[in-house]
Structure formats: structure tokens, C-alpha cells
Amino acid sequence: MEKARVYWFFGLSGSGKSTLSDAFALRLNDFGQHVFRLDGDELRKGVNKDLGFSQEDRMENVRRAAEMAQLALKQGFTVVASFISPEEIHREKVRSVLGEYVEMIFVDASIDTCRTRDVKGLYQQVEKGNIKEFTGVSAPFEMPNMEELRISTDGTTVEHCVNVLWEKLIVSRK
């Protein structure tokens, strides 16, 4: 197993970031890695509950998460993070904080798939007009141009996605 790294999963709400990150973290743990898990929803309930969704607040959300990932990394943890990270400027911030230790993983799913999954009911809230600035619908999501890896979750299983990630991120780099 390689040294500790940060695996930063990003994509639209409902793309499967948290589900895939959880499963990937379990696989890493099964192979002896000490994993520290960071999730955007969880941070917004606690550490980042003072932040809204303005451009400045989104950047601060990502910056804080990247700084937390760096602290865990310095303690020898492998970090698995899942954050929407909607714009390239956010992803550049992650790269600037974490440098060579970060693997950016774009979790790609069509907007229709995301709406179908909508476990939090957010897309319904957007359609009702209750949420104004929603990434991918009424707020921008910039398709990545420098991602390290793209994984599509449309029409496939979590297990298949984890196997693909494992092969590309772990096995092929031994």
C-alpha cells in the first residue's frame, strides 16, 4: 500500500460522491490504511455551519476542508473527501493546499441521474423555488479540465466503481 494521500471526490449533488467515497474508504481501511473521512454535508452541519453559498463562502468551505485534510495527512491518515467543488477555482484551491498529495476524482453523473437519486430532496426544492442558487441547475458547475480521474456512476454499481478506482489509483501505481 502506498503512503497516505488525499482522495478528493467532486461532482454534482446526487452524483454519488458520498456513497462512493464511503465505499472507497472502507476498501482502504480493509487494506490497512488509517482513513480520515471528510464530507461536505457533514462539515456544513458543524465546522462550516457559519457559511452560506455565496462565491466567497463556497471558497472558504473548500479551503477549510483542504486545510483539515492537510492536518490529517500530516498525522499519517489517508483522507477521503467528498465535496461538490463546483468551479475550477475551488479545485485549484484544493490543489494549492494539498499539492502532490491529492488525487482529484470527478464523480460524473447526468443531471437526470442526480435528480432521480435526490435522497435529500434538494432538486425538488429547487423546482419549487425554495432553493435559488443550486449547483448544476441555477448555479454553475464547471466541468473539470484537469481532473486526475473521471468515474461515471450512471447505470453502474458502487462496487464496480470502487473496483475501477482501486485499479487506477492503487494497483496500477504499485
Regions found by a protein language model. Give the residues of each.
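Small-molecule kinase domains that catalyze NTP-dependent phosphoryl transfer to phosphate-bearing small molecules
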Residues: D108-I111, T116-V164, V171-K174
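ATP-dependent NMP and nucleoside kinases share a basic, alpha-helical "lid"
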Residues: G46, D50-G52, A69-E127, E133
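The conserved Walker
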Residues: S13
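Hydrophobic anchor at the beta1->P-loop junction of P-loop NTPases
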Residues: F9
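Conserved beta-strand scaffold positions in the cores of enzyme catalytic domains, especially
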Residues: R37, V102-F106, E148-R150
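Extreme N-terminal, non-catalytic leader segments
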Residues: M1-V6
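Conserved lysine of the Walker
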Residues: K17
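Conserved substrate/cofactor phosphate-moiety recognition/catalytic segment
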Residues: S21-E67
